[in-house]
Amino acid sequence: MVKAEPARGEEPIKKRNVIVVGGGIAGISTAIFLLDDGHHVTLFETGQPDKGTSSGNAGVISVASCVPTATPRTIANVPSMLLNPHGPLMIRWRYLPKLMPWLSRLVLNAKPSRVQRNARRKAGLLAHASRNYDQILTITGLGGLTHQPGLLTVFETERGWRQAQWILKLLIDIGREVEILNSNEIGQVEHGLKPIFQHAFLTPDSGHILDPGKLMIGLHEAFLARGGVRISERILGITRSNPKSVSVTSSNGEYTAERLVITAGAWSKKLLETIGIKVPLEAER
């Protein structure tokens, strides 16, 4: 692992008691990195490591996935998506009043200037993805679970290819590596595809996890083996009575630590609301 050493004149990192709520890929990775820095870590997770969101997914490490959801094209397509019973967008109308603050921010962030800004910020975060996976897999001895052939995006029609030009320009403008492929080159990169695709672009710095479920089981086992504590209790709320500690209330009692990390996915919003913090977070599914 490449560890960040304190700069000259800075004090070493203080070792703390930390609670992590949520044991998905974000939570378990955070917990292991904290352990590696010498902190005492307690992880709260009620589900099995290889179930829930962490099961049945593609395991993609997509460094180039920095195009925001909020774009002018997304907003323009909302009416047709809602009217299509088989479309990718569905809204429970009874939930619409609660959803409006999030939707308002979505529309606001679809301005071209904000799309550029948000893409650059996402790119800055994702630039560390491959390196961080390499670090944590080295720490835990699970290095054989990654493969980096790049991410290939293919287009069957000229219309689809033309509509994607703004995405290509955005990726290039923010410094992502992109390779443009013609129909012959597509077949050389991916032999299993039928020769029906006319255009494609490849982002070579992307990869994927070969077995996401196996990875999650391995990370949880490594966390426990390295001295981490896992408690299978559901967290119901958060309290903070003083600046130096924070407590969480579970289905079985109260636990206190110096620091708290919330990585509970869509459930993070309700947990944070128990201490008056509101975040613009909604479930995608």
Regions found by a protein language model. Name each.
Residues 162-174, 196-259:
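Helical element adjacent to the flavin cofactor pocket in flavoenzyme catalytic cores
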Residues 58-183:
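Dinucleotide-binding Rossmann-like beta1-alpha1 core, especially the glycine-rich loop
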Residues 39-40, 176, 228, 277:
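Short phosphate-binding/catalytic loops that engage adenosine nucleotides
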Residues 1-18, 36-37:
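Extreme N-terminal leader/targeting segments of oxidoreductases
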Residues 47-52, 250-285:
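Central helical "cap/lid" subdomain
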Residues 21, 63, 262-263:
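Redox-cofactor binding/interface segments in oxidoreductases and associated redox assembly factors
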Residues 36-55:
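Glycine-rich FAD pyrophosphate-binding loop
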